[in-house]
């Protein structure tokens, strides 16, 4: 691949759109690009041939749905800074119902963790998991289950932004926001625009694609969020020789405790935000993560668990990378990685 040197200003894409005043200095890259990885070929047969008009006023086209299809590949975009300081690539994996946009920008137009970690000198690989975004999804002939869609109220009430059930309102003035919450509520409507359907039966395909990415890019550092906790720990257990560190940001799912010993040589940081005791589900989900961390320690692993309020970082929702203090949390993660000898 031909390498080239250039500087770009990564401007935000959320409303308020194209707001360079909220962005940082131009980012100097030695390269950037994208690719797809993983996937499989399936065959569909026995379906009727249809004639469709594919565009208004167009000429009808005969569409035969029978044949071979490429499915379950994953889209990955990478950014390689000119002044590299991270000793290994940093892979960012998003949570459920979301895409790699999670890390690209914030709902109110500030830098996301993608930009922040590039500026800190990390080669960053940001992906859309199988079934999401530019990775696409398979037809109902391949995936038999139905996708799940989120209402606008659901993340507000479930991601510890609002005060729980009934706290969202179509009138922003009537929203019941948790006191001191750092999520940019003024941009909540923009946040809901990035939500995509999710399936509950595609875990094997997602894990297969993430494993293919690790095989292609690593050794590396894994940074994953929420639903990707289960994927990240599972892939690390399968490829422990390729993972140099794990950063688990509010993992909603943990790994297999019986396999925790496989991560013995991988330094791991687990980060939790605020308001967890006030939520109906998160105390249990955090306990699952803590139990897995204990299993890792029992097996000889090194795990640091940070509850942000306990270190003076308060007000974080489940979407820490979007909160108004996202830079402070990014600094904490980067310092931890640097202290582990993984960045200069």
Language-model region placement:
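Conserved alpha/beta-hydrolase
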Residues: 110-136
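Conserved acidic catalytic loop of the alpha/beta-hydrolase fold
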Residues: 200-221
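Short beta-strand element of the alpha/beta-hydrolase
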Residues: 86-96
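Catalytic active-site module of serine/aspartate enzymes centered on a nucleophile-bearing elbow/loop
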Residues: 313-315, 319-344
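Active-site glycine-rich loops that stabilize anionic/oxyanionic intermediates
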Residues: 94-106
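Gly/Ala-rich beta-loop-alpha elbow adjacent to hydrolase catalytic centers
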Residues: 223-232, 236
